[in-house]
Curated annotation (Swiss-Prot):
Record PROSITE patterns: SH3
Residue intervals passing through the bilayer: 15-35, 45-65, 71-91, 104-124
Ranges where the record places region Disordered: 134-175
Record topological domains on the Cytoplasmic side: 1-14, 66-70, 125-309
Designated gene of the protein: SHO1
UniProt cross-references to Pfam families, sorted A to Z: SH3_1 (PF00018)
Protein name, UniProt field: High osmolarity signaling protein SHO1
Organism of derivation: Paracoccidioides brasiliensis (strain Pb18)
Subcellular location: Cell membrane
CDD domains named among the record's database cross-references: SH3_Sho1p
Amino acid sequence: MAQLDVNNIMGDPFALVTLSMAMIGWLLSLVTCVISDVQGIFPNYVWWAVTYMFVTIIGLAIVMGSQTSHVYAIAIVGYLAAGLCFTTLAVNSLVYDGSATKQAAAAGFILQSMVIIIWIFYFGSTPRSSTRGYLDHSGGAGNEHHSYRNSKPISNSYGRPETTVSGNQPPQMYTSAQLNGFETSTPIAGYPSTATDNPNNAGRFGQAPIGSQTNLTPGNNPVVGAGGISLGMGGATDPSNANEISQPTEYPYRAKAIYSYEANPDDANEISFAKHEILDVSDVSGRWWQAKKATGETGIAPSNYLILL
């Protein structure tokens, strides 16, 4: 569950400035609306706008403080769009009045409307947009905390690299006894015969052909696990190769994390990283990138949590 941390707001200039401006505008409109209501006739609708904006500002402060804006971005834009309508109607009800307090209240709603427009543009943009990327980069990585992490933000249907661990399926083990009788005794067009009764069926390098009884004797038969990973001779599993993806030697790209991410504990190939952390990336194709942290730790990372530098 996301944890609220005030440092996430204090360390983010965009969140700090916009929330401060919105709260100043709301306080200005609240005080002047109270004074105007005491002095004389006051449109009751404006109180709904004041209440709605207070709840909206508090909600956005919680979202920014817990770094869950990427989870609630669509809902945030919807609430802000409604709030922009309410503040605009409140301005229209107050700005044309000759009372100085009502005009001051209208000024407070105008300030809130300006902040709402900025928020709609920010939360309505994708993390890969240039403006959104610039605002995200303005936050210091040193002030970032692991306040929000999701171990499974992306489903496996996005083309995630499959491993014997992440597949959650027992590997299919085949021994020579199980394969007995499946050898091809009749030659097929374009393929050499692998029958064991053919004396000329020796391998090119003096070994028995693949699929022959000689090649599949107990203790020599290669066992294949799920995903086509060879488990060695005689069915012995090599733990260093069965559960890990081969590591590249070069990382020509650099990427910056736009969100925090915690690796799935059931998959040793994933890595965890914090927001604004810089990673070296070897390949930017696909939805999961092979990345390397500054500490030397390597693994796969979801591409929609990263932005290329």
